[in-house]
Every structure is written in C-alpha cells, then in structure tokens.
C-alpha cells in the first residue's frame, strides 16, 4: 500500500463522517502504557472497520517530547509513537465489536494482553513534506488487505498507510507493516 492511496487532508472531515468516536475510557485503557511514561499524544479518535480494513482519524498534541528537548517540529520518533497510539486505539473497538474476522475469538481482555507483547512493526518508512507543529495536528490511518500468514510463526499481516497534517500546511506520511502474533 502506498501513502498516495490516502485521501488529501482537505477531505478528511468529510470522510470521517462514516466513522465512530472511540470512547475516552477505552482510549485511556489502550493508551495507559503511554500515559504511564508521560507520552500520551492522542487526544481523541474515530474509527471504522470492516472485514478487510481499518480506518481511523485522530487529533494529537505533543506539549513536551518524551525523549528529547523540543525540536519545535514533529519528527520520525514521534511519527511512530503517534502511529502506534492511533493504530492500537482503532483496533481495540474493532476487536471488541468483532469487526475483523481474523481477530474474532479475541476478547477485549485478550487484545490488551497481546497489545504490547504480540504486535510488531515489521518495517516502516516515512516522509516529511513540510514541518508539522506538534502543538496541534491530526492524522488519518488506513490499514487494508489484512491477511493471515502461515509460516514458522502464524501471524496477521497488517499493511498500513498514515498521513499527518496541521492547520498551517505541515505534512508527513508513512507506510508501516504490522504483524500481530498469537492470533485466534
């Protein structure tokens, strides 16, 4: 999947109309590992899932970087942290509502048990087109063509594309391939 498959940020508000808000109590639970370290950046999120895809939108703020003094702009480490937060948050309600066939059989408790220990980034790439203001920015995540891979380890392959933008024209994007182990 290519980030060129994503819709432009100008259309994000229209597109997100078909999504459902993720409740703050669920976000708080999903993002607890980040809150624990003082780096919860995701403020709120919306999602939609079907048999073969997960779509999510999120709004973020990074008041203070978790690992370095402020650079004044959104950077590669923060891109991955924000990707993780939006992806974990989007998959949680999809698992709870049994919207992803390959994960049916997992309860929400199973999801939380596997969230950190069984989900991996297999590879990633990112592009930074214009600096993004970390104080207020948004993202769109699209994961498509989910498939179970049967090798030495059986896992769910999740190809994702993500884009970030701010109100001043800042823009960045990335492609991330996830692997979820210990699937039902």
Swiss-Prot record:
Keywords: Fatty acid metabolism, Lipid metabolism, Lyase. It catalyses: a (3R)-3-[(carboxymethyl)amino]fatty acid + holo-[ACP] + H(+) = a (2E)-enoyl-[ACP] + glycine + H2O; (3R)-3-[(carboxylmethyl)amino]decanoate + holo-[ACP] + H(+) = (2E)-decenoyl-[ACP] + glycine + H2O. Its EC number is 4.3.2.11. Pfam families: FcoT (PF10862). The keyword Lyase applies. The keyword Lipid metabolism applies. Disulfide bonds: none annotated. Disruption phenotype: Deletion of the gene cluster mmaABCDE causes a significant decrease in the intracellular accumulation of zinc in Sauton's medium where metal concentrations are relatively low. Coiled coil: none annotated. It comes from the Bacteria. Belongs to the FcoT family. This is (2E)-enoyl-[ACP] glycyltransferase. It comes from Mycobacterium marinum (strain ATCC BAA-535 / M). The gene is mmaD.
């Amino acid at each position: 999947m290519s980030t060129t498959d994503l819709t432009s940020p100008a259309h994000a508000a229209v597109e997100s109309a078909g999504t459902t808000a993720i409740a703050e109590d669920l976000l708080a639970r999903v993002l607890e590992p980040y809150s624990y370290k003082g780096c919860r950046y995701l403020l709120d999120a919306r999602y939609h899932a079907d048999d073969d895809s997960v779509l999510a939108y999120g709004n973020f703020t990074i008041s203070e970087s978790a690992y370095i003094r402020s650079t004044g702009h959104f950077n590669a480490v923060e891109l991955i942290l924000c990707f993780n937060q939006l992806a974990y948050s989007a998959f949680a309600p999809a698992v709870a509502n049994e919207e992803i066939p390959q994960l049916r059989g997992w309860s929400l408790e199973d999801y939380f048990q596997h969230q950190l220990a069984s989900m991996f980034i297999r590879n990633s790439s990112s592009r930074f087109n214009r600096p993004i203001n970390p104080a207020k920015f948004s993202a769109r995540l699209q994961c498509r063509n989910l498939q179970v891979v049967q090798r030495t380890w059986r896992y769910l392959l999740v190809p994702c594309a993500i884009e970030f933008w701010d109100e001043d024209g800042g823009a960045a994007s990335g492609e991330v391939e996830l692997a979820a182990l210990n699937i039902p």
